[in-house]
Swiss-Prot record:
Protein name: ATP synthase subunit alpha
InterPro entries in the record: ATP_synth_asu-like_sf, ATP_synth_asu_C, ATP_synth_asu_C_sf, ATP_synth_F1_a_nt-bd_dom, ATP_synth_F1_asu, ATPase_a/bsu_AS, ATPase_F1/V1/A1_a/bsu_N, ATPase_F1/V1/A1_a/bsu_N_sf
Topology in membrane: Peripheral membrane protein
Protein residues bound to ATP: G169, D170, R171, Q172, T173, G174, K175, T176
Localization: Cell inner membrane
Source organism per UniProt: Serratia proteamaculans (strain 568)
Quaternary state and interactors: F-type ATPases have 2 components, CF(1) - the catalytic core - and CF(0) - the membrane proton channel. CF(1) has five subunits: alpha(3), beta(3), gamma(1), delta(1), epsilon(1). CF(0) has three main subunits: a(1), b(2) and c(9-12). The alpha and beta chains form an alternating ring which encloses part of the gamma chain. CF(1) is attached to CF(0) by a central stalk formed by the gamma and epsilon chains, while a peripheral stalk is formed by the delta and b chains.
UniProt-listed Enzyme Commission number(s): 7.1.2.2
Gene Ontology CC terms, in alphabetical order: plasma membrane; proton-transporting ATP synthase complex
Length: 513
């Protein structure tokens, strides 16, 4: 069958009329070099700082260096199969992570993908990992406590909701233990917790998760993990991802606690990325913006006022303030708190808990050094009873340290000095506490009351720990109603003082100390 020219032209016209062009405009570039997780891309003229770049194989990179004729980007995930000449695309998006209550009780990676083998994560949407911190007008002063369950911290270095309290010390001084106990103590407080593990061994993190589960705290906690074997990019981004998950609760009028364990490793990961991107190194080879790295993260921990929460939730939540409390951890080298990263984070935070190797090795655990540990805003958040009873503890320890140094050279000491030394030794013993054994406000108050009002004067130093354990057990058994009242109100008046005195007097009659 032959077609004449008219039929052919009609057929072509018909085909042209039916042809449907689906146009997809995207900014495309070409990889010009790949090395150590860093790619250089030519041709992405419209890329933005921090934008996600789509790579072959459903992977992404983040644009960090925008140069005249190329873009330096860091790959999130494996990069061994990337090669020069491969095409990449702009996405027009910045990195987002899943947020919501469905993440509680789960272990996720930096990108929010589950790694605990419990199936997919339920989320209430996505949040960008980088967010601007609330402004001054949107904040409210810190006046509600976060109880860590540690006598030494809650009495001398109190932490408030919305505060940033640095935990700093050498390796193996109990920094993680203190933070984990603080999370365990929030089981019944209603405070949601986020634990961000940066650059740690997978076995260490598995142990932490197991402990949280054993003590019933995992259901209240999101664990964000970037292990030592993961890329520097994921270690650098993990704290921001965890912070976005914590902000979900803060912005909805709830309270959250986030632990960054630890920011020293994040700074090292960021230094690695910066050096590979050929950014100019500064002090200790860190880049010039390492202060901004931590300040923009820690400023997001805040207590926001009811107006902010109401505006954010579009009127769904009224009259409630929200808070995100941060416990960043920094590891020092041989107790050097004057190094670059420690001094940066000390200047950003609202106080620090300094843990000392010497104290830890001499059996004083938690190894808190009360001399240089401080809480700049937490005092306003302390409960009345703790504020009233904790004042003498810090003074007693300060006097004891001064006299202990002096008494090494003086052989004959007067009675007053001996009493102060003895009292200081007993208070030091009293502040010792086992791991995974947080104490309630009432239990702490009872123990501090005993020290403050001289009930330990006739107790031998060696028996102080057993005296405390027996006293707390006796009070829990015989006076649970009073302890519950103190836990609920936190008040201290003549009536409560009289009852506490009565408990101690009757307890001391039960056996000789």
């Amino acid at each position: 069958m032959q077609l004449n020219s008219t039929e052919i032209s009609e057929l072509i016209k018909q085909r042209i009329a039916q042809f449907n062009v689906v146009s997809e405009a995207h900014n495309e570039g070409t990889i010009v070099s790949v090395s150590d997780g860093i790619i250089r891309v030519h041709g992405l003229a419209e890329v933005m700082q921090g934008e996600m770049i789509a790579l072959p194989g459903n992977r992404y990179a983040i644009a960090l260096n925008l140069e005249r004729d190329s873009v330096g980007a860091v790959v999130m995930g494996p990069y061994a199969d990337l090669a020069e000449g491969m095409k990449v695309k702009c996405t027009g998006r910045i990195l987002e992570v899943p947020v919501g209550r469905g993440l509680l009780g789960r272990v996720v990676n930096t990108l929010g993908a589950p790694i605990d083998g419990k199936g997919p994560v339920d989320n209430d949407g996505f949040s960008p990992v980088e967010a601007i911190a609330p402004g001054v007008i949107e904040r409210q002063s810190v006046d509600q406590p976060v109880q860590t369950g540690y006598k030494s911290v809650d009495a001398m270095i109190p932490i408030g909701r919305g505060q940033r309290e640095l935990v700093i010390g050498d390796r193996q001084t109990g920094k993680t233990a203190l933070a984990i106990d603080a999370i365990i103590n929030q089981r019944d407080s209603g405070i949601k917790c986020v634990y961000v593990a940066i650059g740690q061994k997978a076995s260490t993190i598995a142990n932490v998760v197991r402990k949280l589960e054993e003590h019933g705290a995992l259901a209240n906690t999101i664990v964000v993990v970037a292990t030592a074997s993961e890329s520097a990019a994921l270690q650098y981004l993990a704290p921001y991802a965890g912070c976005a998950m914590g902000e979900y609760f803060r912005d909805r009028g709830e309270d959250a606690l986030i632990v960054y364990d630890d920011l020293s490793k994040q700074a090292v990961a960021y230094r690695q990325i910066s050096l590979l991107l050929r950014r100019p190194p500064g002090r200790e080879a860190y880049p010039g913006d390492v202060f901004y790295l931590h300040s923009r993260l820690l400023e997001r921990a805040a207590r926001v006022n009811a107006e902010y929460v109401e505006a954010f939730t579009k009127g769904e939540v009224k009259g409630q303030t929200g808070s995100l409390t941060a416990l960043p951890i920094i590891e020092t080298q041989a107790g050097d708190v004057s190094a670059f990263v420690p001094t940066n984070v000390i200047s950003i935070t609202d106080g620090q808990i300094f843990l000392e190797s010497n104290l830890f090795n001499s059996g004083i655990r938690p190894a808190v050094n009360p001399g240089i540990s401080v809480s700049r805003v937490g005092g306003a958040a302390q409960t009345k009873i703790m504020k009233k009873l904790s004042g003498g503890i810090r003074t007693a320890l300060a006097q004891y340290r001064e006299l202990a140094a002096f008494s090494q050279f003086a052989s004959d000491l007067d009675d007053a000095t001996r009493k102060q030394l003895s009292h200081g030794q007993k208070v030091t013993e009293l502040l010792k506490q086992k791991q995974y054994a947080p104490m309630s406000v009432a239990q702490q108050s009872l123990v501090l009351f005993a020290a403050e009002r001289g009930f330990l004067n006739d107790v031998e130093v060696a028996k102080v720990v057993s005296f405390e354990a027996a006293l707390v057990a006796y009070a829990d058994r015989e006076h649970a109603e009073l302890l519950n009242h103190i836990n609920q109100t936190g008040n201290f008046n003549d009536e409560i003082e009289g009852k506490l005195k009565g408990i101690l007097e009757t307890f001391k009659k039960t056996q000789s100390w």
